[in-house]
Every structure is written in C-alpha cells, then in structure tokens.
Amino acid sequence: AMCWWGEAYANGLNINAGMSEEQNRMAIFAVKQAERLSANASEIEKALIAAQAARFPDDLSADRMELERQYSAMMVKAAKQFPQSDDLAVLAAESAMNTTPWDYWDPATNEARPQIATAISLIERVIANNPRHPQASHLYIHLMENSPDPKMAEAAADRLVANAPPALGHLVHMPG
C-alpha cells in the first residue's frame, strides 16, 4: 500500500512544480491502489493514504489548491494524532508549504502566514527530537530564508553541510 502511496505522493505538486493532467491521473490511480491494499496498513499509513485520497479525487476539474488545503489539513491533523512520527510531521509541514508556495511571510506584518506558522512549529518539533533529520533541516531553511530572521536556519544549514551525503546535490547546495 505504501509503495502506491509513494507513487501518488511523487506525482503531486510541490513548492517548485505544479502537476500535469497525466501526473494527476497517475496519482489518482496510485492512491486507489493504496486504498485497495491498506487493510493491513498501520494507523499512520492509513492516515497518510486517506490524506492522499482527499488530495487526488476522481474529479480532474476540482480546484487543485483547495484540494491541497484539504490534504494539508488532514496531514496536520495526522501529525498531531501521531506526534511520535517525525517523518509524518515533516510531510505535514511540506503539505502546508504547498498551500502557499514561496509566499510564507506576510510582508506587511513580517508574520508567518497561519499555515506556515504551523509548518514551522512542526519542523521545530522534529529538529528538537531529531536534529539530523535532513528533510526537516532542508524545509526549515526554505521556511526561514525570507523570514525577518533567516539566521534562525543557520544551525539547520550547518547540519546539512555536516551530514548530507554529497550525492544529494539539492541538500548540499542549501546551506550556501
């Protein structure tokens, strides 16, 4: 079930790229397979699959950003339900970032947008639990780079330099 979940996840949009109709169709197919195979999945896995199912309904004409907001709400709820899962918290934070790509801070107030404040809180929780979590450090840099105080992510950048395998080019370039 989780292999199919991953297929759906990989076809979804992210902060750097939208998704084509073909990717949407592939994600819909994949999430249906994940649902079909989920009987023996863990509770966390079932929550992840349910969130992806909400993200990729059969209706190709559905408002993509509204679906992303629904997906994010389900992911944040799951992260609160299973606070022991750092990976789930990181995925939930990423889902919140996808609802407002590269527009994380209100320029009038210098405050994080509400869903981004949630993402920051989730990522900071993961970093406190597992400072070497590479995706938590990666996302924290992105969350803070346009904040009023980007130096808040300096320690995360230092950890990426020290711990990211050189083959992970995007992560290795992040601290620069």
What are these regions (language model features)?
Residues 4-84, 91-128, 132, 137-167, ...:
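Short coil/linker segments at helix-helix boundaries
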